[in-house]
Amino acid sequence: MEYITKMVHDFIEDHDDIKKTDVMEFVGMSESAYRDFFKKGKISFKKLIKFAQLISRETGKGSHEILSEWCLHIIRTETIKNAFEYSAITTNAPLLKRLLLLHQNTDGVLKQTVEVYRIVYNYMVGTLSGFELKDAIGRLHNITSKPLLILMNIIRQYNNYFEGDIQKIINEVSEIQKDITNLGPRETFYKECLTFRVCELLAPISLQLNDVKSARDFAESIINANISAKKKSDAYYVIGMSYLPDDKNVCLYNLRKSYELMREVGDLQYIQEAKFNLDFAKVFHGVELDEDSNFRLRAYQKARNGKISLAKLHTILERGDKDNFIIFFENTAEKSIDVMYNCLESFFCQENFFFARLVAKELEKAGADSRALRPFLKFKKLIKGEVLIEKDIISHFNRSDGGSRICI
């Protein structure tokens, strides 16, 4: 901890224009708390984030970079736990790995922390699949820390999501939220991070259930938290898709934003997925695709425009996995009312009400009875129970390194 206090002290000493009162106000510390930090190294993780942001603002060095370095010098148990969650929620796998190695021989609550976050790390780096999470969590015993128990329950919901068991998630999420709300004042950082994780889980689920207002609210909370480009990109995807049937310009703006952010992330697979999502929306709205667009999307657009046969399209669509997008293509390309109604029924029975709505839109374009389609165009399923969210769920992450806010 001495490493951190010395770095902060030297920073303040080197900047004559920065007064102690200004620092205390920025970080949100009383005079006594300020003294305790420098004399005893006593400070909450949230206050460390504010110090990192202050130094970042004046030096140009990224606050995440500064904080990642500090996480390796923290000595108090509660703050170390927060460092683990910080590394996980910001998807900083290298930092999480170093924390796991640093604390691998601990006992008590820290041992529990290492056991839980080792599973998180293995999932992050791909050595553990989403379908294996529940079993991995089930092998953990004697976990007593309330935040860790809540995190374990959220991880189980990731497994349920991969298995397509949306109803089980809906049944359990309100209890998870109650448990988060009941966390004490010492667990404020965890409370906000766990709430963020609930938003991250429910944003795509609400979209699938065609509850677009909730989907947008959850996504806005994720964007405003400003945790990472990857998470913001995922949130812009949800917002963009939620406008797909109704507002071409808003839809394309948000999906383009998602794509641009994913390019910042630099992961080729994620970039390709974001580009696919943007181009899918372009096809849906009749916008000509670029030559570098996905070959199946271009084939679908050509078939819709009569440039290739439906037989050739189906041959092309057979290459690769079949997700909801490809199923949509296969069943709407020939504009057959019967085929599209069967597809609509299939999506609806699977409770994928958003894609059911997209097919209903295509049926409407093809001349099907709009009165019969009205229930499918408007149907949505609400998640039972109140999920308490705020746009500023993680207020201490809201300040970017440049000091500006992220807005939609």
PLM features: residue spans?
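C-terminal non-catalytic interaction modules
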Residues: 1-17, 22-30, 259, 280, ...
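Helix-turn-helix repeat elements of alpha-solenoid scaffolds
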Residues: 85-99, 122-138, 161-182, 206-221, ...
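Recognition helix of helix-turn-helix/homeodomain-like DNA-binding domains
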Residues: 27-45, 69-74
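Generic helix N-cap/helix-start motif at coil->alpha-helix transitions
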Residues: 1-3, 43-47, 72-81, 107-117, ...
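Long, mid-chain structured domain cores
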Residues: 60-190
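Tandem amphipathic alpha-helical repeat scaffolds
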Residues: 77-89, 112-127, 151-166, 193-208, ...
